Amino acid sequence: MFSQCLTRVTAALAVAGCLTLTGSANAHATAVGSTPVQTFQYSVGGMTMKVPTGCMFTHAIRGSGKKITYQNAGVDCGFAGALGSGFCNWRIDFTYADTRNRTYRTSRGRTHNECKIDPMRSNSPQTLPRYGKACASLYVTGVRRVSQCHHITK
């Protein structure tokens, strides 16, 4: 299990590096960013669950201008984080805000009642009505635990 998770993390970092470094003659943009998931505890069915350090929340987005052709977010855990029970009652939301930081659209993910060490969600392609930022957030038992955003500009 540990080597499998370490392999996934290594592959994810390699893909992220490729996406970030790959250039294109067209005006297409790709952004990939990761934010560490802070250690936290929560209760599920009377049991205390602990998420240790070693997990990263990664948000990838592709498109051009206000048009998003691909968007995905998820958690990858390595080392001690891969040994934990994971994230129970989780969901991933995508939110969109204007240049004044006012959220105008939310794509709320489905709440997954199972526990998963590597929760992930993709969102459908779309065209945004305005520039600003696109964010992905991980919720566990209804509490936002980590977010990662990308600015959408001309």
Regions from the language model: what does each represent?
Residues 125-129, 133-153:
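Short, exposed beta-strand-loop hairpins at the edges of beta-sheets
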Residues 100-117, 151-152:
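Solvent-exposed serine/threonine-rich low-complexity stretches and specific carbohydrate-binding patches
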Residues 109-133:
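Short, solvent-exposed, Trp/other aromatic-anchored flexible loops in extracytoplasmic proteins
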Residues 24, 61, 83, 94, ...:
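Secreted/processed peptides and extracellular or luminal domains of membrane proteins
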